[in-house]
Amino acid sequence: MQYDLYVVTDEGLSRGLTHPELARRAIAGSADVIQLRDKKCDCDYLLRCAMEMREDCNKAGVTFIVNDRLDVALQSQADGVHIGQSDMPLKFARRVAPKGFIIGVSAGTVEEALRAEHDGADYIGFGPVFPTGSKADAGPVCGLDLLREVRRRVSIPVVAIGGINAANAPEVLAAGADGLAVISAVVSQEDVTAAARNLKAIISQYRLSGRQ
């Protein structure tokens, strides 16, 4: 699975676009992963969004992940779920999920990352690397040094998140991130597709340079 550009949808931070609209525009900008994240909407709306986004992602060959809601992820036949430290236990999610189902886990410390790997996570969402206003529950800033340490200590993919944008993306990649998860750097922009495409070009250029 390719994690290079991992776009998290957020209607509250968009310019009036719905989750499916954000996803379609990010997909057009060459996003590799789309995560549906909404802590406030009702379950019916979330499921409708998930079904529509899963279809669009499948057509484009893009991985589709649902944040937190394993029930919605399973009902919509998403590729996986992403859970935080205060969400359901990873071991429970793994027991319930079908074979091949992707489970990502948020981590903000080396210990949390190691535990997630031990418990069977497929990847780690590590951060916030930089200060961010996109997530009220983001936790304390981790920084690039801690990102390097986590990348050194775990063998599963590490996707960096938190305050990442086009300006600082190269240094996050240089710290060892396998992918960049972004919210406002894409979904809050006037042209979502162009913002995604620009970030993907930065990542691709970095990869092609042979620095990673």
Curated annotation (Swiss-Prot):
Instruction: Specify which residues bind Mg(2+) according to the UniProt entry for this protein.
Output: D68, D87
The residues listed in the UniProt record as binding 4-amino-2-methyl-5-(diphosphooxymethyl)pyrimidine, with positions renumbered to this chain, are Q35, L36, R37, D38, K39, N67, S106, K135
Identify the residues that bind 2-[(2R,5Z)-2-carboxy-4-methylthiazol-5(2H)-ylidene]ethyl phosphate. Answer: T132, G133, S134, G163, I183, S184
Q: Which Gene3D superfamilies match?
A: Aldolase class I (3.20.20.70)
Instruction: Enumerate the UniProt keywords alphabetically.
Output: Magnesium, Metal-binding, Thiamine biosynthesis, Transferase
Q: Name one GO biological process term.
A: thiamine biosynthetic process
Q: List the catalysed reactions.
A: 2-[(2R,5Z)-2-carboxy-4-methylthiazol-5(2H)-ylidene]ethyl phosphate + 4-amino-2-methyl-5-(diphosphooxymethyl)pyrimidine + 2 H(+) = thiamine phosphate + CO2 + diphosphate; 2-(2-carboxy-4-methylthiazol-5-yl)ethyl phosphate + 4-amino-2-methyl-5-(diphosphooxymethyl)pyrimidine + 2 H(+) = thiamine phosphate + CO2 + diphosphate; 4-methyl-5-(2-phosphooxyethyl)-thiazole + 4-amino-2-methyl-5-(diphosphooxymethyl)pyrimidine + H(+) = thiamine phosphate + diphosphate
Pathways involved = Cofactor biosynthesis; thiamine diphosphate biosynthesis; thiamine phosphate from 4-amino-2-methyl-5-diphosphomethylpyrimidine and 4-methyl-5-(2-phosphoethyl)-thiazole: step 1/1
GO MF assignments: magnesium ion binding; thiamine-phosphate diphosphorylase activity
Q: Which cofactor does it need?
A: Mg(2+)
Q: What is known about what this protein does?
A: Condenses 4-methyl-5-(beta-hydroxyethyl)thiazole monophosphate (THZ-P) and 2-methyl-4-amino-5-hydroxymethyl pyrimidine pyrophosphate (HMP-PP) to form thiamine monophosphate (TMP).
What HAMAP family does the database record attribute to this sequence?
TMP_synthase
Entry similarity comment? Belongs to the thiamine-phosphate synthase family.
Q: What is the official name of this protein in its record?
A: Thiamine-phosphate synthase
